[in-house]
C-alpha cells in the first residue's frame, strides 16, 4: 500500500516521532501512511499527546505522551462519534469485570498463575486471554508511571476501562494506525 513519505503540514512533534518510528516501527508507520489520518495531517503526536497529570503520561524525548489512546483522546476530533459510542452498550463491556459472572469465572478457572506487578497475587490467564480480549481489561499503570501492566495492555476489548476514566476502545473496530471505517 501507500507509504508515508512526509506531510507538508506535519507538526514538529509528529515529524520527530516519524524520524525514529519509520525505522523502529515500519509496520505502524506504513499503516498510518495509508490512513485517512495521514492524509488529514493527523500524526503520532496529535493522538498520543498527553497532559502531565494524565495517569499514564510520561516524557518521551521532548514531549509528554501516553502509549494508550482512549476515547477521550479521540473525542478531540471525533466528539460526536465518541458521544454515540459512550452512550452505547458496547462501551460498557468492561463492567463485567466487577460482576458476579466474572467472579464465578475466576473461581471456576481457579488458576491465578499469571503474576505481574499489577497483580502480585496473580490473575487468571484464562480471564486475560479470554474474557478481557473482547470485553476489555481495566488498564493498570505500573509504579514507574510509564509502563502499562502487560496483563491489562495491549488490549482492544470494546469495553476497556482506561486510566483516564473513559470506557471503551475505538480500536476494537477501527484498528490502530490505519483507523479504517471500512474495517469497522
Model-derived features with residue positions:
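Short sequence/structural segments immediately N-terminal
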Residues: 1-184
Amino acid at each position: 500500500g501507500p507509504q508515508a513519505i512526509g506531510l507538508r503540514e506535519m507538526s514538529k512533534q509528529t515529524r520527530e516521532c516519524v524520524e525514529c518510528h519509520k525505522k523502529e516501527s515500519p509496520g505502524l508507520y506504513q499503516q498510518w501512511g495509508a490512513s485517512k489520518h495521514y492524509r488529514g495531517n493527523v500524526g503520532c503526536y496529535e493522538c498520543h499527546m498527553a497532559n502531565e497529570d494524565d495517569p499514564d503520561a510520561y516524557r518521551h524525548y521532548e514531549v509528554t505522551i501516553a502509549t494508550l489512546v482512549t476515547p477521550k483522546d479521540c473525542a478531540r476530533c471525533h466528539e460526536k462519534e465518541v458521544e454515540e459510542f459512550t452512550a452505547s452498550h458496547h462501551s460498557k463491556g468492561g463492567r463485567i469485570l466487577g460482576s458476579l459472572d466474572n467472579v464465578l469465572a475466576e473461581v471456576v478457572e481457579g488458576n491465578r498463575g499469571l503474576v505481574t506487578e499489577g497483580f502480585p497475587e496473580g490473575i487468571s490467564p484464562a480471564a486475560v486471554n479470554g474474557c478481557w480480549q473482547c470485553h476489555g481489561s481495566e488498564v493498570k499503570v505500573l509504579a514507574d508511571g510509564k509502563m502499562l501492566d502487560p496483563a491489562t495492555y495491549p488490549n482492544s476489548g470494546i469495553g476497556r476501562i482506561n486510566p483516564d476514566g473513559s470506557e471503551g476502545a475505538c480500536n476494537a473496530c477501527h484498528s490502530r494506525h490505519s483507523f479504517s471505517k471500512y474495517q469497522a
